[in-house]
A protein has these predicted regions:
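Short, solvent-exposed helix-helix connector turns and helix-capping sites enriched
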Residues: 58, 227-228
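Short, flexible loop/turn elements at secondary-structure junctions
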Residues: 118, 148, 203-205, 217-219
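Hydrophobic alpha-helical segments
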Residues: 129, 228-230
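A long amphipathic alpha-helix within ATP-dependent nucleotide-binding catalytic cores
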Residues: 146, 166-212, 230-251
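Glycine-rich phosphate/pyrophosphate-binding beta-alpha loops
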Residues: 171-174, 216-225
């Protein structure tokens, strides 16, 4: 019996969805290196057991599993407070903003980008335009950021485990420009209290500055080619961290 069993979301063709596809071979590699069966994968829980079951797939898939456990949904990470430093962001950000506050912020700080403040992917990031506000649920507090004035030359996803960079993958390229390594490692170090996450950074076309775009829990997270033993260990750690967060939240409301 493995310590960790990854419950993979299946596609209609019977194969794992793209988010989960790297897990079987990555688990095999991790087990081979450890010379023991630490990780397993399944598309269905049919009598299989493990110390910990970790769902892998879309946000909806993971939230459904959390609901079956009697827990709440995942929360949006956006920019963790530790990362809220001008040297990393190059812009102002605002948390827990209601739709009624947007006009005032727009008048004072210029063009704005709006994201869900609590529920990841409840709607896609959109610019602040009156005609688009109807797409935002009235009960969703917003994460708002100033628009970065420069275009992006490149965007990268940095995989961070307890403050250490495990891997980095490009996901948008106007020009092949890698981010400033020292800046990225400094960003990662500020996030050392998080067991595992993905940090998106951009290299600005004008001036080449490296800035943080947003963070994601390493759950229901696009991998862009990241795989192997580090990946499965991070997925385990992120899930256990989510369970601890939810337990702490429940205890705080008793």
């Amino acid at each position: 019996m493995p310590d960790i069993l990854f419950l993979l979301q299946g596609a209609r063709n019977g194969w794992p969805v793209s988010l989960a596809a790297p897990f079987p071979e990555s688990c095999d590699e991790a087990n081979w290196l450890a010379n023991e069966e630490k990780f397993g994968c399944t598309l269905a829980l049919s009598g299989q057991t493990a110390k910990t079951i970790v769902p892998v797939g879309s946000i909806e898939f993971v939230n459904q599993y959390l609901s079956q456990m009697g827990l709440g949904p995942m929360e949006a990470m956006n920019i963790p407070p530790e990362l809220e430093q001008e040297q990393f962001l190059g812009r102002r950000i605002f948390r827990d903003v209601s739709k009624t506050e947007l006009s005032r912020l727009r008048a004072e700080f210029g063009p704005l980008l709006l994201k869900p403040g609590r529920h990841p992917k409840r709607f896609e990031a959109i610019p602040h335009e009156e005609r688009l506000l109807g797409e935002i649920p009235d009960n969703e507090l917003l994460f708002v950021s100033q628009m970065i004035p420069s275009q992006f030359a490149s965007e990268w996803r940095v995989f961070v485990s307890r403050g250490r960079v495990m891997d980095i993958r490009p996901y948008f390229m106007e020009h092949w420009l890698a981010p400033d390594a020292a800046v990225v490692h400094d960003m990662a170090d500020t996030l050392r209290e998080h067991p595992a996450l993905a940090l998106d950074v951009a290299v600005l076309l004008e001036g080449g500055r490296t800035v943080a775009i947003e963070c994601h829990p390493f759950i229901a997270c696009g991998l862009y080619g990241f795989e192997g033993p580090k990946m499965v260990s991070m997925a385990r750690d992120a899930w256990l961290g989510e369970l601890r967060r939810q337990k702490s939240h429940l205890l705080g409301h008793k």
